[in-house]
């Protein structure tokens, strides 16, 4: 129809613009065959992603028809009454939105890129880390958090577990050193969606990254003797203990989360507690004598996130500010520098005390009594200290 004819048919500018705007094709990310809540298999995920990308390519390349990508978002925790939340991404943009909604184009590009990555990686049956995907296109993703966010969107729409799918895993962070072998038996799904038992071994006598494994894995220790577990905050302290391992008690396993532990380090400890507790005589956490060290220790034992990974056998043993003061008073020991608490440290210590005493004002009977007292002492002395030069005797077990 000629423009003159359109102008006669549509009297207003708004009607004319609407008539000239091409109709969009809606493409849904979630699989209709699994709307009942059952998770998709790897084969189903691959088939649906290929179909999804094929529809998008045909619309854009062959029909010059813009598309609208529709997907579900997670509801807030505890929200069961509100309807499902759907988000729509339009591509390409036109009209006044072309300049003002550039961020939507980036979202669409990230989602399509990740779907392509999943389609390429999933048939290989090998794990890929979020970090590797991020560095494959830093300009597009900008932050690793964006990769994690959109992978969660893909997993949620296919009803997949956050940790058990797509063969894309977080980069390993935690380190372990063991004087005996540790075997991890893991059930994995092949590309044909068939279960397969996989055995991974942490070899003795050298530090290594905690390997990735699923939530239902089983861990077995290659020893029949009782052992101890020492968890330290920093990699530097971990390395120092490994280099001076002869000073520690025999059969001591060393672990570090390199700061705040990732889920894999916490899951590893939880599995040790679940399957090997009869062989573990003691499990101790050592961090810096500062509020952040205490917060890191609580991440292992009393974290509000993912309670399934809490390790109840782990005990906070310090270092405590009083231990540092005692070591500085001894003649033959190297003095440890005491640092002043800054405002941020003070606020964190105060908030920790408030949260730990929220349900009980009776500190004397609290299971976290030692942690609360340590926070109070650090506030009282207005001092903190790092554990790098602490006397190695505190790690010994008699």
Curated annotation (Swiss-Prot):
The active site is at residue 135. It comes from the Eukaryota. Residues 40-175 form the Topo IIA-type catalytic domain. GO terms for molecular function: ATP binding; chromatin binding; DNA binding; DNA end binding; DNA topoisomerase type II (double strand cut, ATP-hydrolyzing) activity; metal ion binding. It is an enzyme of class 5 (isomerase). The keyword Transferase does not apply. This is Meiosis-specific protein SPO11. It comes from Saccharomyces cerevisiae (strain ATCC 204508 / S288c) (Baker's yeast). The lineage of its organism: Eukaryota, Fungi, Dikarya, Ascomycota, Saccharomycotina. The gene is SPO11.
